[in-house]
């Protein structure tokens, strides 16, 4: 169902990911799918990775055997299509299975201050 009141409205949507990418649920995968759909519909998508979700911005993070989705690849595709991705700088050394591994190009090392500014400036804030 198409809602005419939504036509022409561009929203700034911030999605904050917290969970380990491959935690035996589809929470992160569905968050990335939502981001892709919103981006495709013309919205300004901002993604902030913190806690164990920072692994999603690391090339060393691979899908476990039997999992049919590559979340790192999905995140890179979102960046290539215009989504802005920031990753907690403090979490780089503290969080994830791959702590201290670098973030890939396009995933900007960021701060809590930058996240707080995004929260204030976004029309919608979602957490996953």
What does each model-found stretch correspond to?
Residues 63-92:
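A glycine-rich helix N-cap at a beta->alpha junction
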Residues 97-117, 121, 126:
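C-terminal structural segments of small proteins and small subunits
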Residues 27-41, 47:
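Histidine-anchored nucleotide/phosphate-binding helix
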Residues 54-57, 94-95:
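Short, active-site-adjacent cap segments at secondary-structure transitions
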Residues 13-29, 57-62:
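Short, glycine-rich nucleotide/cofactor-binding loops
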Residues 61-65, 102-105:
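Short glycine-enriched, charge-decorated loop/helix-capping segments at active-site entrances
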Residues 1-10:
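Short, Lys/Arg-enriched N-terminal segments with co-localized hydrophobic residues
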Residues 35, 45-50, 85-89:
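Short internal beta-strands
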